[in-house]
Amino acid sequence: MSLALAHKRRILAEGVAADAATVPAYNPSEALNSPANAQKHLALMLTALDGDLERISAINSREERQRLKRDELLPKYLDYVQRYRAAGLVYPNPVLVQVLVWLFDTVQFEAGLELALFAIGDGQEMPERFKRRDVQTFVADEVIDWAEAEYKAGRAPEPYVSNLLPLVDGQWQLFERIPARYHKLLGQLAMDNEEWAQAIEHLDRAVELYPEIGVGTRRAAAAKALAKAEAAKQSDE
């Protein structure tokens, strides 16, 4: 190599190094400081998320999948979600919605509901692979599915069912069978506690919402027990 060519290459290398030194280091805290930067950062996060979803799909054990979501992936992505919320920007954010799904998958209902309410206000939608595209329906279904399974297993599903009821049978517009399932379960819980009037109230509301909910036998038993309790009370007086 000639001395002239070697000198030219050295000058070019020094120029590249100088240019690189002027580029600021990547700072996650500044990645959401503008809409353009936010979209670039979202693309990076989605690439990482796709890889992590493939990792989950490759695991056969449900317990191991839950551990991965709870112990590794949620801490990894929650920081980004918190920064997105703090930035005040509004755009479709599949990463936020996936974090929401994982919170409910891992039965972190308090954090999940808090994020769900934000997502609803933000206009976020569920991923295309979900038949239920609105967040409200996803949350209501997830909680009642879990609660019914817990009750069947002899464990207490409260206070989650009661806490969500004002939204499920009130603020949120849902297919009527969903709030009817909440009232059906709450009616059964009230019967277990011999709170007959409250049980009848829930069971009647379940039928009002969705006549095919199937609580006729329970409703008759609660009414019979209530009449018996009232008769006993009157005789004591």
Model-derived features with residue positions:
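Residue signature of alpha-solenoid helical repeat architecture, marking inter-repeat boundaries
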Residues: L89-V90, D134, F175-I178, Y210, ...
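Residue at a conserved register position within TPR or TPR-like alpha-solenoid repeats
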Residues: W102-L103, H183, A190, A223
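Residue-level recognition of tetratricopeptide repeat
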Residues: L100-V101, E148, Q188, A221
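N-terminal alpha-helical interaction modules that lie
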Residues: M1-V90, L117-Q173, K228, A232-E237
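TPR repeat positional signature
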Residues: V95-L96, L100, V135-V143, H183, ...
